[in-house]
């Protein structure tokens, strides 16, 4: 009887252990199956969430590239128009009067810039043939457009060796502080350049010239 009771007791213990082990296996199997079932769901949700996200990223990148291209194009157009725009000569309300065709009318004076190169005497003759004279600078205020001139042009200013003065074609003396005379080389004639500067030049040297006609 003791032996049978011992076997029953051991059997009960084994059954208990088996039952516990079986429960552990079931729990482990359930956990594994739950994870396997959960993973596809999670992956599916990830894919569902990732697809709109990457689509949005793609749209954002495309719009960014398009914006950069548009900015580049507009910048190029703006710079091109900026560097190619013509210099506008300011106009005043003062009466200018009639000028020859294609001449510039500004503050009661008519101006023409000639691109052909002539010596001083030939330039003077060309202006006289058009009822005008070589440029005479008499006022920085009334002739402020001359600040726009960038190259050298003959003007009607000559040096008088006998008294060392500079005179205009009409015989008037150059007013002090009106022009800065710069000796570029030996000569008795003067070229006009920018910022009210006069450059001494040999009268026989070919240069472009400016003709001027008073309207009053």
Curated annotation (Swiss-Prot):
Glycosylated position list: 131, 163, 202
Extracellular side, ranges: 73-216
Signal peptide coordinates: none
SMART domains, alphabetized: CLECT (SM00034)
Record-level GO cellular component terms: cell surface; external side of plasma membrane; membrane; plasma membrane
Tissues of expression: Expressed in natural killer (NK) cells, CD8(+) alpha-beta and gamma-delta T-cells. Expressed on essentially all CD56+CD3- NK cells from freshly isolated PBMC. Expressed in interferon-producing killer dendritic cells (IKDCs).
Alphabetized UniProt keyword annotations: Adaptive immunity, Cell membrane, Differentiation, Disulfide bond, Glycoprotein, Immunity, Innate immunity, Lectin, Membrane, Receptor, Signal-anchor, Transmembrane, Transmembrane helix
Start and end residues of each C-type lectin domain: 98-213
Cytoplasmic side: 1-51
Name of the featured protein: NKG2-D type II integral membrane protein
Organism: Homo sapiens
């Amino acid at each position: 009887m003791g032996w049978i009771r011992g076997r029953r007791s051991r059997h009960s213990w084994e059954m208990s252990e088996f039952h516990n082990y079986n429960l552990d296996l079931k729990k482990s199997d359930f956990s594994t199956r739950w994870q396997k079932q959960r993973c596809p769901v999670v992956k599916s949700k990830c894919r569902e969430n990732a697809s709109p996200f990457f689509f949005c990223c793609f749209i954002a990148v495309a719009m960014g590239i398009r914006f950069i291209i548009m900015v580049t194009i507009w910048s190029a157009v703006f710079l091109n128009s900026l560097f190619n725009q013509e210099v506008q000569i300011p106009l005043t309300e003062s009466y200018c009067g009639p000028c020859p065709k294609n001449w510039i009318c500004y503050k009661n004076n008519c101006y023409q810039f000639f691109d052909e190169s002539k010596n001083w005497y030939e330039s003077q003759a060309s202006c006289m043939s058009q009822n005008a004279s070589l440029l005479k600078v008499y006022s920085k205020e009334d002739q402020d457009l001359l600040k726009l001139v960038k190259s050298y042009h003959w003007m009607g200013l000559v040096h008088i060796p006998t008294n060392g003065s500079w005179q205009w074609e009409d015989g008037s003396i150059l007013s002090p502080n009106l022009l800065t005379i710069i000796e570029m080389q030996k000569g008795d004639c003067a070229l006009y350049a920018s910022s009210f500067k006069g450059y001494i030049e040999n009268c026989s040297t070919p240069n472009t010239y400016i003709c001027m006609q008073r309207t009053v």
